[in-house]
UniProtKB/Swiss-Prot annotation:
Entry similarity comment: Belongs to the class II fructose-bisphosphate aldolase family.
Enzyme class name: lyase
Residues the entry annotates as binding Zn(2+) 1: 87, 192, 223
Enzymatic reactions: beta-D-fructose 1,6-bisphosphate = D-glyceraldehyde 3-phosphate + dihydroxyacetone phosphate
Keywords for the protein's UniProt record, in alphabetical order: Glycolysis, Lyase, Metal-binding, Zinc
GO BP: glycolytic process
GO molecular function: fructose-bisphosphate aldolase activity; zinc ion binding
Active site: 86 (proton donor)
Keyword Zinc: yes
Cofactor: Zn(2+)
Binding locations of Zn(2+) 2: 116, 146
Function in brief: Catalyzes the aldol condensation of dihydroxyacetone phosphate (DHAP or glycerone-phosphate) with glyceraldehyde 3-phosphate (G3P) to form fructose 1,6-bisphosphate (FBP) in gluconeogenesis and the reverse reaction in glycolysis.
Protein's name in the database: Putative fructose-bisphosphate aldolase
Length: 302
């Protein structure tokens, strides 16, 4: 049962609706205004719900500026879009981010925060997660956590590649659900960053067992999904995944356009082309995880 302060949370209904209608919410990591615009425009064009994901770097780099901009854009959109802080690994940053969203300020902030203590021991991970979940919940913010370690490197995430990889078990999932989280990001062969020469090797049976154990109580989140095919997404959604995090598949388009066209176009045109390329990548993801067109159904059910 969600914390009483979460009754008006904007993000929780998205995953609940996605799970019950067999699709996933596209959750796109971005670092700048172009990325924010690309997600909003893609969601409105595809009539898809979505999440904008910022890393703690956004707060360290620009204080509340990017957060307020993204949060305001989410609330002004014609489809359901929410703002999520991804891979928040410093307790003080988590509290700072949560305080940006306090209702008494009358300014929008994060709708959800990933409390990522996976770089600590399991016991410390659980203790800190429980403490920080309570802090976020009291401010009306939904939470996500990551049992085990989803190895690899990703821009904005502390590298765990040298740590022993740990896959999530149903028993660990139960322990994390007990901390009060709303969403769980299990490790079942998915990794942040590059998958290496063997390619994608997912343990679907493990994901199914986790879903059977806790899927009725928390939403399941897929990390490390950048190279996945539509078939892989379908298998994950069949096993309970309701939110798909994507980073490089979208942000690589920014880098590609900048490398190819910087210096040959006016700056205004360059920013437009970057945004258009990122938007096209987001729309492709929406089609692959079947969120296209679902916003209308969500709004009809409200």
């Amino acid at each position: 049962m969600p914390h009483p302060s979460l009754k008006s949370n904007r993000a929780l209904p998205l995953l609940t609706f996605a799970r019950t209608h067999s699709f996933a919410i596209p959750a796109i990591c971005v670092y700048n205004l172009e990325g924010i615009l690309a997600i909003i425009r893609a969601a409105e064009h595809k009539r898809s719900p979505a999440m904008i994901l910022l890393f703690p770097w956004a707060i360290q780099y620009a204080d509340s500026l990017l957060v307020r901009t993204a949060a305001s854009a989410c609330r002004a959109a014609s489809v359901p879009i929410t703002l999520h802080l991804d891979h928040a690994q410093d307790p003080e940053i988590i509290k700072r981010a949560a305080d940006l969203s306090r209702s008494e300020t009358h300014e929008p902030g994060f709708d959800s925060i990933m409390v990522d203590m996976s770089h600590f021991s399991k016991e410390e991970n659980l203790r800190l997660t429980r403490e920080l979940v309570a802090y976020c919940n009291a401010r009306g913010i939904a939470t996500e956590a990551e049992p085990g370690r989803i190895e690899g490197g990703e821009d904005g995430v502390q590298d765990t590649v040298d740590l022993e990889g740990v896959l999530t078990t149903p028993e660990e999932s139960e322990e994390f659900v007990a901390t009060g989280i709303n969403w769980l990001a299990p490790a079942f062969g998915n990794v942040h960053g590059n998958y290496g020469p063997r390619g994608v090797q997912l343990d679907y049976e493990r994901l199914q067992r986790i879903n059977e154990a806790v899927g009725e109580r928390v939403g399941l989140v897929l990390h490390g999904a950048d190279p996945f095919t539509k078939e892989i997404f379908e298998k994950c959604i069949e096993r309970g995944v309701a939110k798909v995090n994507v980073n490089r598949a979208v942000n690589n388009e920014y880098v590609k356009v900048m490398r190819e066209k910087a210096g040959s176009l006016p700056i205004t045109r360059l920013h437009e082309e970057v945004t258009n390329a990122m938007q096209a990548a987001v729309e492709k993801i929406m089609d692959m995880i079947d969120s296209t067109g679902k916003a209308e159904f969500m709004m009809d059910e409200k």
